[in-house]
Every structure is written in structure tokens, then in C-alpha cells.
Amino acid sequence: MVETRLGWEAGGGLGAPGGPGGKLGGLGLAVGGTHSWSGLLKRVDRREARAQPRLLVLGCLLCQGISCPSCGPDMFVSLQKSLIDVFINAASLSHDFHNLSTIMFNEFDEKYAQGKLYYINATKSCHTNSFHTPEERDKAQQMNNEDLSKWTLVLLYSWNNPLYYLLLELRNMKNLSEAVISSAMEIENMSEKLQAFIESQFRKIIVPVLKMIHEVSNTWSRFSSMTFSDEDRSISEYYNLFYCLRRDSRKVDMYIKILTCRTRKTC
């Protein structure tokens, strides 16, 4: 088994992978590096700077009963609306994320998997199975916001490596439409944006999520290379990947929509 370690690059970003394992997160997380907590926290601070409306709302709440000229009724309503808008936009993005994942899976299935039995073991092969994330809405609704956002970020981080290597290999597949490649690129971009959203709204869950992923870091080694000599094996692996991405994107969409309806108080 290949040993992997999690590390963070202070300058980070989701470009090419840092070291053989590749990037894992929107914070510049990489496999194969060493821990740099100061670098991680600097990245988090920059995320937090974009979440000032949240902090201002909290400040106004703390000012109840005290004279706070900058936190009048109009200001509070405006800031609250701004926060709600952020969640609404995230819910729209997560919907598109799942929708595009479904379209990409359906196109791949139609072109490569007709008459095959790939679907039989597809669910069992998902690299995120070890996290036991809630499948059904009623179970997800029983979770508090912190746990729900934690599972959302776990799933999103878990797909950074597979998506990176998937994009590298898709370009070498014969007769694959440009639409599938474009969809994969857009899905990767959407995932980065959703990660940034969760990181900015639920800052304190980031380190626990990274530790959780570190405990099952063996799940990444499978994607260090997706090149197979047998074409049928290769197509089977891609099928499983598309299948699992569709499943996990549905979970992400469901979790974010629950968080949004709670923020809007419409649940």
C-alpha cells in the first residue's frame, strides 16, 4: 500500500497536484506534503474576509439592548438578506453541480456501457463509502448545521483527486465527445466554488474534516494513475467513477439545500 500524507501549501490553489498525490482542497491541500498549519490558517483567513456579512450580523445580534448606530433595523435586515442570498446562490450552484454530473454519467453510460454489467458493483466501488454519509433526506435533516456542512465538505474534498486525474485521462479516450470533457471541467470548477462557500460559512469544521480524511487517506492512492492496459477494465473504472460522482453530487445538493432552507426558515 502506498503511504500518503496530507499537507498544505501556503500559496495553494487548485492547479496541478503538489507531489505525486495531487491537490485535495480549495485551500491548497495536497497529498504528499507536510503539515503547515500557518499556511492553512492564512488561506482560511482570506476565505473569512469574504464572509464579513456573517460577522456583522453576529455583531448586531450581540448589540441588542445597547446603542449600536451601525446596526439599526434596516442594516440588520440588509445583512440578513445578504446572507440568505449567499445560501440561495450556493443551492443553485449545487443543483447545477448534480444536474451536470447526471448528464455526464448518462452520456457515458449510453456511449460505453450499453449491454455491460458495470452497474452491478458500481455502488460498492465508491471511494467515499467509508465515510457513511447520510443517503436519505430525512436522516440528513436530523443533523445539525455543523455536521451537515462537515459531510458536505468531506464529499467535496474527496472528489478533488479523482476529478483531477479523470480530466487528464478523458482526453485520451477514443470517440469521447468534447461535451463530456467540458462537463468534467465545469464540475471541477463548481466543486471548488462549493468548497469555498462551505469554508467561508463554517470555518471551524475545516481542520476536523481534514483530520477525518487523513484517517482514511488510503482511498486516494487508487487515483494516482487511471491508466489501464485492458480497455474494458478502463471503461469499467470510469463508469464507476461517473456513477459515484452522480450519487455524491446528489448528497451535496441535498445537504446544501437543507442548510439553505434553514437559513431562510422555510423548512
From Swiss-Prot:
GO terms for cellular component: extracellular space. GO terms for biological process: cell surface receptor signaling pathway; female pregnancy; mammary gland development; positive regulation of biosynthetic process; positive regulation of lactation; positive regulation of receptor signaling pathway via JAK-STAT; response to nutrient levels. One of its GO terms (molecular function) is prolactin receptor binding. It comes from the Eukaryota. The lineage of its organism: Eukaryota, Metazoa, Chordata, Craniata, Vertebrata. Keywords: Disulfide bond, Glycoprotein, Hormone, Secreted, Signal. InterPro entries: 4_helix_cytokine-like_core, Somatotropin/Prolactin, Somatotropin_CS. It comes from Bos taurus (Bovine). It is found in: Secreted. The keyword Membrane does not apply. Placental prolactin-related proteins may play a specific role during gestation. Belongs to the somatotropin/prolactin family. The keyword Transport does not apply. This is Placental prolactin-related protein 2. Glycans are attached at N99, N121. Disulfide bonds join C126-C244, C261-C267. Pfam families: Hormone_1. CDD domains: prolactin_like.
